[in-house]
Curated annotation (Swiss-Prot):
This is Large ribosomal subunit protein uL30. It comes from Psychromonas ingrahamii (strain DSM 17664 / CCUG 51855 / 37). Keywords: Ribonucleoprotein, Ribosomal protein. Belongs to the universal ribosomal protein uL30 family. CDD domains: Ribosomal_L30.
Length: 58
């Protein structure tokens, strides 16, 4: 299956609790942390929810 790289580019401090939980659910821990995830509708939905805090490649 195809994969995408998701990088956190903004802090989760002061954000909505649901958005902080989404960042954690994506496996991101700190700014400039990158994870490689499967390109599924569920992951895409999570990325769309916090699009202003992450950068997506691939």
């Amino acid at each position: 299956m195809a994969t995408i790289k998701v990088t956190q580019v903004k802090s989760a401090i002061g954000r909505l609790p649901k958005h902080r939980a989404t960042i954690t659910g994506l496996g991101l821990r700190r700014i400039n942390h990158t994870v490689e995830l499967e390109d599924t509708p569920a992951v895409r939905g999570m990325v769309n929810k916090v699009h202003y805090m992450v950068k997506v490649e691939g």
